[in-house]
């Protein structure tokens, strides 16, 4: 039986890097390595001076949770319309739900937890399929 590794990630030691979206920066929390790739968790923040694309897409996941730590973000979701998430808001994005970003604040920070740790993202023509 494989045991997950113990990991602690402190903000004071944090490095943010470019990732999936060019208009965001990502801080890896070490969960992917600790779980052998089963889960990824990162803090995402708005990248200064970058414009968001608003490109409709979906993720091939088992589970995806977003919790807003600071600021706000708006998404348009398939079958749900536009949803604004503010500090303290949490959303579970079902596997394969089509969505796109509508906008976000300059001070946006959010926690994202996704299973599996490596997942595919596919661009789609529209949110409504």
What annotation goes with each model-predicted range?
Residues 2-11, 17, 100-129:
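Double-stranded beta-helix
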Residues 15-57, 62:
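A short glycine-rich, His/Asp/Glu-containing loop-to-beta-strand
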Residues 43-46, 58-75, 113-116:
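Short, conserved beta-strand element in jelly-roll/cupin
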Residues 43-45, 89, 99:
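Hydrophobic/aromatic beta-strand elements that line small-molecule binding cavities or substrate pockets
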Residues 52, 71-76, 90:
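Short beta-strand segments in beta-sandwich/barrel cores
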């Amino acid at each position: 039986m494989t045991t997950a590794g113990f990991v602690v990630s402190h903000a004071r030691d944090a490095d943010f890097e470019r990732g999936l979206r060019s208009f965001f920066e990502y801080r890896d929390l070490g969960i992917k390595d600790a779980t052998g790739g089963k889960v990824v968790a990162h803090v995402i923040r708005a990248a200064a001076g970058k414009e968001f694309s608003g490109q409709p897409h979906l993720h091939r996941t088992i589970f995806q949770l977003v919790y807003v730590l600071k600021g706000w973000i708006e998404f348009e979701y398939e079958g749900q319309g536009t949803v604004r998430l503010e500090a303290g808001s949490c959303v579970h994005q079902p596997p394969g739900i089509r969505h796109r970003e509508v906008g976000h604040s300059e001070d946006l920070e959010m926690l994202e937890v996704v299973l599996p740790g490596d997942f595919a993202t596919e661009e789609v023509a529209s949110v409504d399929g």
